[in-house]
Amino acid sequence: MNSALVYRIETKNGDGLYIDDIGILDSPTKKTEGAPSHRPFPQRNLQNFLFDRTTDRKSYIFGFRTKKQATNWIKNPQDFEFLSKNYVLSLYHVDDKYITEDKNQLVFNITKAKLIKQYPLKNIQPFGFHTIIDKFKNIFNFISRSNLSNV
């Protein structure tokens, strides 16, 4: 069975950038409506056809594992500045069978994921939007090398 490291921007309590991940995933429309809160949120809609009718969506939450998916969470430096005050970059280890994704977005089953570590976003010092994403990429690479042997 293959596994992956999945990242999520969330509070220390596990609350993400969406008001209601479950409500979005259970949307009856072809695309999720993406009910935003006052906080920034991933702009791309996740196609519901990625789930079959038997999938229990109640345990699935949004995350990312690629640079392209990460850019849907942070659109500009102002988003990052807001997020860095209250949010952490959480790292989860998840078996591939509990991950559903397309090129722009990812959801994973939080009940089947193992929290590896949380990094305060305020400790990441970017100098511009592309630097933020590049720093994430560097963190991803470092974490992957140092943590996969411990999982």
Feature-to-residue mapping (PLM):
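Conserved aromatic
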Residues: 64-65
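Conserved NAD+-utilizing ADP-ribose enzyme module
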Residues: 1-45, 55-59, 68-151
